[in-house]
């Protein structure tokens, strides 16, 4: 555990400057939304910028994981590290997901404020209970980012494991991408879809706009299965183990 904490502190220290860049970028985008909304007298512009920021936030963790992997690959210090590949990858995932979790909490608070602001201005078609929506969307965001981050780890590890096949490894990566998409389309997606009737929950994450003298926002429900979350986590963990075993072969990057 002490070695893991040491790796975690190293990864956090390595990328904290880029975290500030992300935070400044998010503040700039949200601030731009407020300026445009104020000048156009259309408060719903703020909602549009909020949705855009929330979408791009899903890619924060994968981007930071890739950044850590590139730094690790250039230094090659991991080749002499007594920790296994699982600890090395886990520390990078933990640091990246920690960043994302903190920013998600801040964005959630902003979203709740925005919802009440639109409610006070009578710009909502109808009131909805967003309590479960807030919790489930935060879970979905973290799990989705974890899945993409582990995908980055798998592809990075496989790519560098083919160092002796430089003329073929890009072709091999294209084949891997095709297999990955096939696996997701015909195995994972049908599996998750088949479980949608187990533990269904309502999430208000769809929306539409209506014009009645002023533009109003309508939040629409969709139904998700809570069972899909543990399925995604188990598959992601198995992929992480596979990448870790491959890294433990001490592939030179």
Curated annotation (Swiss-Prot):
Its main location: membrane. Coiled coil: none annotated. Keywords: Cell membrane, Membrane, Transmembrane, Transmembrane helix. This is Uncharacterized protein YhcE. It is found in: Cell membrane. It comes from Bacillus subtilis (strain 168). The keyword Nucleotide-binding does not apply. The chain crosses the membrane at residues 17-37, 46-66, 93-113, 139-159, 172-192, 222-242.
């Amino acid at each position: 555990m002490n070695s893991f904490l040491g790796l975690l502190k190293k990864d956090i220290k390595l990328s904290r400057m880029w975290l500030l860049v992300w935070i400044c970028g998010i503040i700039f985008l949200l601030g731009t939304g407020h300026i445009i909304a104020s000048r156009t007298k259309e408060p719903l512009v703020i909602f549009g910028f909020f949705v855009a920021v929330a979408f791009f936030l899903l890619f924060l963790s994968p981007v930071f994981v890739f950044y850590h992997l590139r730094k690790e690959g250039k230094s090659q210090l991991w080749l002499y590290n007594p920790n296994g590949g699982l600890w090395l990858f886990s520390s990078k995932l933990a640091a990246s997901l920690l960043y994302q979790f903190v920013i998600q909490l801040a964005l959630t608070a902003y979203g709740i404020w925005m919802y009440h602001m639109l409610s006070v201005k009578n710009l909502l078609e109808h009131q909805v209970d967003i309590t479960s929506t807030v919790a489930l969307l935060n879970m979905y965001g973290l799990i989705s980012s974890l899945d993409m981050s582990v995908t980055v780890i798998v592809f990075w590890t496989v790519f560098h494991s083919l160092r002796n096949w430089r003329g073929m490894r890009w072709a091999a990566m294209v084949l891997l991408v095709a297999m990955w998409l096939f696996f997701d389309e015909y195995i994972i997606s049908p599996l998750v879809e088949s479980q949608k009737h187990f533990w269904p929950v309502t999430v208000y994450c769809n929306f539409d706009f209506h014009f009645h003298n002023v533009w109003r926002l309508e939040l629409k429900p969709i139904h998700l299965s809570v069972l899909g979350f543990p399925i995604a986590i188990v598959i992601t963990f198995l992929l992480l183990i596979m990448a870790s075993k491959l890294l433990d072969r001490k592939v030179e990057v």
